Amino acid sequence: AKLDSEPGPKESPVKAAIKGMGMLFVNISFWIILLYFATSSLPGWATKNWLPTLFSENLSIDMSEAGPLSTFTIAISSFIGVIAGGILSDKWIQRNVRGRIYTGSIGLALTIPALLLLGFGDSFAMIVGGGLCFGIGFGIFDANNMPILCQFVSPRYRATAYGIMNMTGVFAGAIITKLLGESTDAGNL
């Protein structure tokens, strides 16, 4: 049986892709979600890419210790955040259609004090605690991106929309990583 979301027999895949992107780019909700996702990618990629350097310099430990410490800190706390964020939003959406949006916002809100702790912390507990808080918050946020997208984008265009979101997030991450690297090399960070 043909799914409703499959292109018709006379519609080429290229035409279907162009039509799908056209449908997304006229959807104001998609643009808002894209901006929300791209903006949050800046601290997300910056933290994940620069955390080993931050740990090494601020905690005076070798990179051979800072790399695994930062990876475990972010990975374990993000896993906890994904599980907690998924459970919370699944329960909240049953009472309020905006539950997933609110849950994702709570996750992003947790990243703010985390970034302050990471940036201004002067002890092991503060800096690693900031990393843990960031991971939990970003995990909560990340667990809800696709479900939020599903609330605003037709099933027919969701894969394209999510692909564009991911591409935009990676581009934002590349830009911030380059800027932070240049700033570090210039002695401004």
Regions found by a protein language model. Give the residues of each.
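C-terminal ends and interior cores of transmembrane alpha-helices
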Residues: L108-D122
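A late C-terminal transmembrane helix in Major Facilitator Superfamily
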Residues: V82, F152-G187
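Extracytoplasmic gate region of multi-pass secondary transporters
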Residues: G22-I83, F138-M146, G173-T177
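Cytoplasmic membrane-interface "Motif A"-like loop-to-helix N-cap segments
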Residues: D90-G107
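Interfacial helix-cap and linker-helix signal at transmembrane-aqueous boundaries
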Residues: F55-S56, L88-S89, I93, L180-N188
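Flexible cytoplasmic inter-helical loops of multi-pass small-molecule transporters
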Residues: A1-K19
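A membrane-interface helix-boundary motif in multi-pass transporters
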Residues: D62-E65, G99-Y102, E182-L189
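Hydrophobic core of transmembrane alpha-helices in multi-pass small-molecule transporters
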Residues: F124-I140
